[in-house]
Each structure stands twice: as structure tokens, then as C-alpha cells.
Amino acid sequence: STAITAAETGHLVFSTLHTIGAASTIDRIIDVFPADQQQQIRVQLSMVLLGVVSQQLVPNVKGGRSLATEVMICNGAIKNIIREGKNYQLQNTMMTSRNAGMYSMEQCLEAMYRQGIISAENYQLYTPASAATNVR
């Protein structure tokens, strides 16, 4: 609530949440509020949120860890999805908005796998099942 109010008054607010993925980050923010306030929070969030960067460390083939990221930039389509509570559409919108600077965790992990940075096993382990079936 304080962060949203600060953003509404022109302050740049950074926050960290223990979530993986933009959709779960949005859900976590909204779910903190009582059900009767959630629609208003969606509207406010859609007006002030600039973007979400999600990251996770994934074991790489050299025995260390490599950073996998997801970037969601709040353009008009993303703002509408948040406002309307259709967070299930965020993933698809990010995956088809590469030219706007967005990409999903799945796309990042697939690129890491194809470049030989992570193993097929770790690709499947860190990618939701729907995307992991695309490994070739």
C-alpha cells in the first residue's frame, strides 16, 4: 500500500519479492490485499507499475550457476491485463513481445539450453512443463 502510494505521487519504487515470474509477482502483490480491495489495487498497479524483472540462478554445465531472467515491461497490453485481472495472459504477451524488450523465463532458459550453458535436465527442471516439452 505504501509503495503504491509512493509510486502514485511520482517516486520511483524498487521492491524485491520471492517469486519466480512476472505473473506470480503481480499475483503476490494483489493477494496481499483483502478481496474487496483487489480490483482497486489492480487498477492502481496498472497505472504505476513500470516493469518486473524476475531472476533465478540455474546450475550450469560447468558446475557453477548462471542467471536466468524474465523481463516484463508495462506497455498498454500488459497494463490492460493487470487491470482486468487476466494475469494468465501475461506469459503469452511477454513471449510475443520480444520487439518491445520483453521475454519470458522459458525463452531465456531455452536460449541457455541451446547455447550449451545448462543441461536438458536443468532446462526441464527450471522451466514450467508446458514450455519444457519444446526441447529439441
Language model region names:
Residues S1-R136:
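Short, flexible helix-loop junctions that flank or precede catalytic/ligand sites
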